[in-house]
């Protein structure tokens, strides 16, 4: 499923970069997801394979044409044509990731036992910005009291565990191996 999301997201970002409309399309995709979330009946209609593709595409045109970039309208219709509309959320998430990657932006999750102050978050962001040689860093903060203290940093599939819980687990493993 992830491969499908990546392929569609790459195709869309290639088109939007050519037309210099990546940021507009990012905003449009947020609007589309919001509308689909708020109007579950419309979303179900677009997913329903029992309804003719032409009817679903006409609905997309009526709702979106003139309100969002034409590339996004065409993209939504392509998803209907290929019966991939159920992948829209994953494709949009992958599009956002690719857009950030191409802008040299690092996305990270900071997992902490307690809320961090802005100064602490900025220090962490700056450290990883330099470490990964990125122009900017976007960070999401998650509170997980089970860490006891310290932080875990997640960047893509990589996790850097500098939490007390992580240190205790390492110590436990070391003691068990003796």
From Swiss-Prot:
**Function statement:** F(1)F(0) ATP synthase produces ATP from ADP in the presence of a proton or sodium gradient. F-type ATPases consist of two structural domains, F(1) containing the extramembraneous catalytic core and F(0) containing the membrane proton channel, linked together by a central stalk and a peripheral stalk. During catalysis, ATP synthesis in the catalytic domain of F(1) is coupled via a rotary mechanism of the central stalk subunits to proton translocation.
Gene name for this UniProt entry: atpH
Assembly and interaction partners: F-type ATPases have 2 components, F(1) - the catalytic core - and F(0) - the membrane proton channel. F(1) has five subunits: alpha(3), beta(3), gamma(1), delta(1), epsilon(1). F(0) has three main subunits: a(1), b(2) and c(10-14). The alpha and beta chains form an alternating ring which encloses part of the gamma chain. F(1) is attached to F(0) by a central stalk formed by the gamma and epsilon chains, while a peripheral stalk is formed by the delta and b chains.
List the membrane topology term(s). Peripheral membrane protein
Tell me where it mainly resides. Answer: membrane
Q: From which organism does this entry originate?
A: Acetivibrio thermocellus (strain ATCC 27405 / DSM 1237 / JCM 9322 / NBRC 103400 / NCIMB 10682 / NRRL B-4536 / VPI 7372) (Clostridium thermocellum)
One GO cellular component from the entry? proton-transporting ATP synthase complex
Cite the NCBIfam families for this sequence: ATP_synt_delta (TIGR01145), PRK05758.2-4 (NF004403)
Whether Nucleus counts among this entry's keywords is no
From the Swiss-Prot or TrEMBL record, give the protein name: ATP synthase subunit delta
Which of UniProt's keywords are assigned here? ATP synthesis, Cell membrane, CF(1), Hydrogen ion transport, Ion transport, Membrane, Transport
Q: Does the keyword Repressor apply?
A: no
**Molecular function (GO) terms listed?**
proton-transporting ATP synthase activity, rotational mechanism
Which protein family is it in? Belongs to the ATPase delta chain family.
Q: What is its subcellular localisation?
A: Cell membrane
Any single Pfam family the record assigns to this protein: OSCP
């Amino acid at each position: 499923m992830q491969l499908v999301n990546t392929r569609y997201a790459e195709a869309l970002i290639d088109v939007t970069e050519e037309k210099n409309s990546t940021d507009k399309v990012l905003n449009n995709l947020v609007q589309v997801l919001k509308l689909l979330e708020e109007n579950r009946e419309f979303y179900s209609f677009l997913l329903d394979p029992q309804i003719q593709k032409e009817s679903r595409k006409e609905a997309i045109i009526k709702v979106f044409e003139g309100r969002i970039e034409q590339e996004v309208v065409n993209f939504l219709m392509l998803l209907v044509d290929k019966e991939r509309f159920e992948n829209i959320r994953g494709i949009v998430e992958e599009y956002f990731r690719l857009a950030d990657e191409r802008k040299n932006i690092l996305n990270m999750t900071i997992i902490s036992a307690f809320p961090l102050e802005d100064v602490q978050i900025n220090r962490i962001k700056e450290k990883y910005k330099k470490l990964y040689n990125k122009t900017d860093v976007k960070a999401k903060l998650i509170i997980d009291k089970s860490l006891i203290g310290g932080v875990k940093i997640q960047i893509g599939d990589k996790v850097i565990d500098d939490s007390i819980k992580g240190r205790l687990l390492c110590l436990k493993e070391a003691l068990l191996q003796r």
